[in-house]
Every structure is written in C-alpha cells, then in structure tokens.
C-alpha cells in the first residue's frame, strides 16, 4: 500500500532587499516603523557601580579561565609564596583546586587552597 503524498506547503515570497543579494530591507524604507526619539536617562551612581562590579567580575572569571593548567604563584598570609598548577575552582569560588603545590616544606601532589587565605596570585598567560 502506498503512503499518501504530503500536502504541499505554500511559499511566501518576500520583496527583494536593497542590495542585490536579497538580504534585508533598507531601514529608511516604507515598511520600517518610525523609531521614537527618546532621550536616554542619565545613569545613576548605582547603575554605574553595578556596571563597574560586573566588569570586574567578568575580568576575574576570565583570569580564572586563563589560569587553568598553568603554573600560578600564590601569595598567602605572612608573605608565604607557593607555586602550583591551577586546576579548577568550586562553584562559589571559595576554594582553588591545585596540583604540584610547591610549599616551603615540600611538594603536595594535590591540594585545595582556600580563597580567603590568598592575598594575590600571578601567572603568565
């Protein structure tokens, strides 16, 4: 038994665009809705601070991503410096998972560094 043929679907043909490749329409064409001239409200101090915090957080998260698999020098309290290969961080960025941690008293194969103990870190991208 044969299967019935599918019902043909009508095709809607759009008018040609402003360039020869039929891509898009001219923004000043008769079909474009007029855009109202609305002045932007002045940014408040709070929105400026929020943008600054968002920018700093994005830079911090990008630096964490760039550190993965690289040797990183961590400066801890009391001026202690340790070097380790950065692996990952937990979801709330409270701990760093590192490997080959070189401390003043020896090398640890794997370790967790609490972010509250870290003063700064440096690495070469």
Swiss-Prot record:
Gene Ontology CC entries for this record: cytosol; Gemini of Cajal bodies; Sm-like protein family complex; SMN complex; SMN-Sm protein complex
Localization terms from the record: Nucleus, Nucleoplasm; Nucleus, Gem; Cytoplasm
Region (Disordered): 1-52
PROSITE patterns recorded: SM, SUZ_C
Residues where Phosphothreonine is found: 3
Major localization listed first in the record, in broad terms: nucleus
Cross-referenced InterPro entries: Sm, SMN_gemin7, SUZ-C
Domain annotation Sm: ranges: 59-125
Keyword Acetylation: yes
Modification N-acetylmethionine occurs at: 1
Keywords in alphabetical order: Acetylation, Cytoplasm, mRNA processing, mRNA splicing, Nucleus, Phosphoprotein
Domain SUZ-C as annotated: residue spans: 1-29
Pfam families: Gemin7
One term of GO molecular function: RNA binding
GO BP term, pick one: spliceosomal snRNP assembly
Subunit structure: Part of the core SMN complex that contains SMN1, GEMIN2/SIP1, DDX20/GEMIN3, GEMIN4, GEMIN5, GEMIN6, GEMIN7, GEMIN8 and STRAP/UNRIP. Part of the SMN-Sm complex that contains SMN1, GEMIN2/SIP1, DDX20/GEMIN3, GEMIN4, GEMIN5, GEMIN6, GEMIN7, GEMIN8, STRAP/UNRIP and the Sm proteins SNRPB, SNRPD1, SNRPD2, SNRPD3, SNRPE, SNRPF and SNRPG. Interacts with GEMIN6; the interaction is direct. Interacts with STRAP/UNRIP; the interaction is direct. Interacts with GEMIN8; the interaction is direct. Interacts with SNRPB, SNRPD2, SNRPD3 and SNRPE; the interaction is direct.
Function: The SMN complex catalyzes the assembly of small nuclear ribonucleoproteins (snRNPs), the building blocks of the spliceosome, and thereby plays an important role in the splicing of cellular pre-mRNAs. Most spliceosomal snRNPs contain a common set of Sm proteins SNRPB, SNRPD1, SNRPD2, SNRPD3, SNRPE, SNRPF and SNRPG that assemble in a heptameric protein ring on the Sm site of the small nuclear RNA to form the core snRNP (Sm core).
PANTHER family: GEM-ASSOCIATED PROTEIN 7 (PTHR14679:SF1)
The family this protein is said to belong to: Belongs to the gemin-7 family.
Official protein name in the record: Gem-associated protein 7
Gene name, Swiss-Prot/TrEMBL: GEMIN7
